[in-house]
Amino acid sequence: MSTTNKIYFIAGGNRGIGLSLVKELSNRKGTVVFASARKPGAATKLQEWSKSHSNVHIIKLDVSSLESANEAAQEVTKVVDAVDVLWVNSAVFHSFGPVVNTPDDVWNSHYKTNVLGPIHVYQAFYPLIKKGRSKIIVFTSSLAGSMGAFFPSSQSAYGQSKAALNYTMKEISFELQDEGFIVISIHPGAVRTDSAQEIVNQHAEKKPEILDLFAKQALTPEKSASDMLKVVDNLKPENNGLFYNYDGTIIPF
């Protein structure tokens, strides 16, 4: 494979925002895109896209398992020896209630996927990113994880997990700054995905303002992905450790 290609790995590239990232990137000239799915056989939209795009490689990955992350990295090394941009987009979001009645299993599942998951992917792919030319790591985060720009809505375990992810990003950016890495978090905006719509519908009766906000302001996955890529395409060393909004503005931690 040509060493002039720019190599991307998108963890969670089988639907929604992740799939839109895969599509836009793979339509660019000189790119190779690895897209992960927990169950590749069930990722029908990604499978269909890869059939017409030979530069897309589907990788099995369950981010909650370090073993799975290591196996995914090994699969990538069968094709390339470096990755330029690592984008961890995998996440769960099934917490839309107050802290007082959010059970342990909800906290644990969010932490396992949204915090340990990105850590597993980073640990497994660090050797590949270190060999890359761009050395960019992107974590898809959320405004829900910002305390400085607190959104007045009960998102308990989800918000806490994204706050922890932002801290993880900040620490990694510090640890890798002397190695030439650029590490950021980015909020994709309120995005019109199937999972987001389902959550909004579940809580529309008690929180009608959420339904209204979602209907008026939600982005399509394609728009969110395109805007975030504009941010990532223009990253410079001095941007290391920042928390971005999809439109390129900075979000306080």
Curated annotation (Swiss-Prot):
Active site: Y158 (proton donor), K162 (lowers pka of active site tyr)
MF-aspect GO terms: oxidoreductase activity
Residues where NADP(+) binds: I17, S36, D62, N89, Y158, K162, V191, T193
Keyword hit for Nucleus: yes
Keywords of the record: Cytoplasm, NADP, Nucleus, Oxidoreductase
InterPro entries assigned: Fungal_SecMetab_SDRs, NAD(P)-bd_dom_sf, SDR_fam
Pfam families: adh_short
Location relative to the cell: Cytoplasm; Nucleus
Gene3D superfamilies for the chain: NAD(P)-binding Rossmann-like Domain
A biological-process GO annotation: cellular detoxification of aldehyde
UniProt-listed CDD domains: carb_red_sniffer_like_SDR_c (cd05325)
Keyword Cytoplasm tagged: yes
Record-stated family: Belongs to the short-chain dehydrogenases/reductases (SDR) family.
Name of the protein: Uncharacterized oxidoreductase C663.08c
